[in-house]
Swiss-Prot record:
Species name: Legionella pneumophila (strain Paris)
UniProt cross-references to SUPFAM superfamilies, sorted A to Z: Nucleotidylyl transferase
Top-rank lineage group of the source organism: Bacteria
Name used for this protein in its record: Phosphopantetheine adenylyltransferase
Record keywords, A-Z: ATP-binding, Coenzyme A biosynthesis, Cytoplasm, Magnesium, Nucleotide-binding, Nucleotidyltransferase, Transferase
Name of the coding gene: coaD
High-level lineage: Bacteria, Pseudomonadati, Pseudomonadota, Gammaproteobacteria, Legionellales
Length: 168
């Protein structure tokens, strides 16, 4: 039993909508890939929200952005996060915290996930200091007003958002 638990703790899930993926997300993924032998970046379909980018596009942008990292896989999911984590035989949910304002929501989420399964722990990482203010929402707003987002997102995301703006 102990070996199974240890194996589960070797695999982490970093879930999010990544709408779009930002350099803050990339920083967390890159650093987490050096901590965990296996990291699954789990892209939520988020049927309750109206995502700016399609689920397939978000997955593709992430694969292009982190595909070079050893031990990192990008997978879409559309079920309850804790169920997805257990299906993947993972023992860690990795979450990013940018500011104190993120903490309250993330604390509640971690508590709920622990209540749903005691086999899974939630760990938090903060992005590098110069990336803490970046959010997908702010990136979308800047892009919608034709602002320069190149310092906030990977180049493939810049191209995708420009393409999207030209279609509108």
């Amino acid at each position: 039993m102990q070996m199974v638990i240890n194996e589960m703790k070797q695999k982490a899930i970093y879930p999010g909508t990544f709408d779009p993926v930002t350099n803050g997300h990339i920083d967390i993924i890159t650093r987490a890939s050096t901590i965990f032998p296996e990291l699954i970046v789990a892209v939520a379909s988020n049927k309750n929200k109206r995502p700016y980018l399609s689920w397939e596009t978000r997955i593709s942008l992430l694969e292009e952005s982190v595909g070079h990292l050893t031990g990192v896989r990008v997978v879409g999911f559309d079920n309850l996060l804790i169920d997805f984590v257990l299906e993947q035989s993972a023992g860690i949910i990795l979450r990013g915290l940018r500011a104190v304002s993120d903490f309250e929501y993330e604390f509640q989420l971690a508590g709920m996930n622990r209540k749903l399964s005691k086999k899974v722990e939630t760990l938090f990482l903060t992005p590098a200091e110069h990336l803490m203010y970046i959010s997908s929402t702010l990136v979308r707003e800047i892009a919608a007003l034709n602002g320069d987002i190149s310092q906030f997102v990977p180049p493939n995301v810049v191209r995708e958002l420009k393409k999207r703006q030209n279609e509108i």
